[in-house]
A protein has these predicted regions:
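Acidic carboxylate diad motif detector
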Residues: 1-47
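Positively charged, helix-rich recognition surfaces that bind polyanionic ligands
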Residues: 38, 46-172
Length: 172
């Protein structure tokens, strides 16, 4: 992969347009980062069908909240990815569906077995298509889990919950 330190980023372009422009290669892209000084470096990582651009930057350390007596518990599962309950008065338990993840995996396994059977006839084990299929599956799963975790955090913030218990407790 290619690494560009903060000295190779055009400060003028960043201040005017909030875009990161890498000198020497003509790559320019929009960013949500507002402070130029916080940017450490930019990495360009080649993938199968695309390139991934990572902007490494510093953020302020978030101080942990003081425990206010409000807690939530999450039970992780397969059909129900997460079941959330809390001791907050009026809190309605929330279930985050896990079936879409099962569906993504089922579709992936079905397609992969089809392609593998075709490849075995040719004497090869992998192809560009199977790698692309695997990338697509990984991206879909990461997207769903990220959206689910973001939803959980917003529920916790909305109900002013400062402590979260996940999984099996030894005392239970």
């Amino acid at each position: 992969f290619l690494t560009f330190n903060n000295q190779t980023i055009s400060k003028k372009v960043f201040i005017k347009t909030n875009k990161i422009k890498l000198s020497g290669c003509g790559i320019e892209f929009l960013t949500k980062i507002t402070d130029f000084k916080s940017i450490n470096c930019v990495r360009i990582i080649p993938g199968l069908d695309q390139y991934t651009i990572e902007v490494i930057h510093e953020i302020e350390e978030v101080k942990p909240l003081k425990y206010n007596g409000n807690l939530a518990s999450i039970d992780l599962g397969v059909n129900n990815l997460a079941t959330i309950t809390s001791n907050v008065k009026g809190f309605r338990p929330v279930i985050i569906n896990g079936r879409p993840l099962k569906s993504i995996n089922q579709f992936f396994n079905k397609k992969l077995s089809y392609y593998k059977s075709k490849l075995e006839k040719n004497g090869t084990k992998s192809s560009h298509r199977t790698k692309r299929l695997n990338n697509k599956r990984t991206n879909k799963i990461n997207d769903y889990i990220h959206k689910s975790s973001k939803e959980i955090v917003s529920i916790l913030k909305k109900n002013d919950i400062t402590k979260l218990v996940i999984g099996q407790n030894k005392e239970w």
